[in-house]
């Protein structure tokens, strides 16, 4: 239905696009066909509310949690966040009964049951359930290692690898084998150890 209303367009969103020609103008907002490839632009482009869209660009977060001080763009996001403090998990999966604090977490979880993987790597075609997993995967192709150890300068592709590496410097071994009680610096080392334990038991 055409109301004659001009579509809301944001110059800041357009600047963020890698390919402005890929824009589709629909009724009240801009939709980019390749929004998964547009860094930091997916939400603004899919948001029909000019005020919320503006906050995303300016960084304004007027809704603050009284418990922890965390701030949000939208009141609905604050409402969902409060569930963490109250322990309430309002969003329940009809398939398996798992419950979640946020609707977005339930949406991601449902992809496990449906097998849906909407985020695809343009380099190799591998698909992922979450955009964050795709972003992490892309580092394999670029050889980018943005996470650097302040102690020794060693760099890593993933933040979790840096966190585990840091355990070497501080002497922490947070991964414990439930079978024998042995502690490990790396989760991968614990996994190998557990396989050996299992193999010994079945031999």
UniProtKB/Swiss-Prot annotation:
Gene3D superfamilies (alphabetical): Classic Zinc Finger (3.30.160.60)
Instruction: Write out the entry's keywords from A to Z.
Output: DNA-binding, Metal-binding, Nucleus, Repeat, Transcription, Transcription regulation, Zinc, Zinc-finger
> InterPro entries, per this entry?
C2H2-ZF_Transcription_Reg, Znf_C2H2_sf, Znf_C2H2_type
Q: Which GO terms describe its cellular component?
A: nucleus
A GO MF label: DNA-binding transcription factor activity, RNA polymerase II-specific
Question: PROSITE patterns annotated for this entry?
Answer: ZINC_FINGER_C2H2_1, ZINC_FINGER_C2H2_2
Similarity-based family? Belongs to the krueppel C2H2-type zinc-finger protein family.
Asked whether the UniProt record includes rRNA-binding among its keywords, one would answer no
Subcellular localization, as worded in the UniProt entry? Nucleus
Report the record's Gene Ontology biological process terms: regulation of DNA-templated transcription
Q: Write out the coiled-coil annotation as residue ranges.
A: none
Instruction: Provide the species name.
Output: Homo sapiens
| Zn finger (C2H2-type) location | 63-85, 91-113, 119-141, 147-169, 175-197
One Pfam family name is zf-C2H2
User: What function is annotated for this protein?
Assistant: May be involved in transcriptional regulation.
Name recorded for this polypeptide: Putative zinc finger protein 876
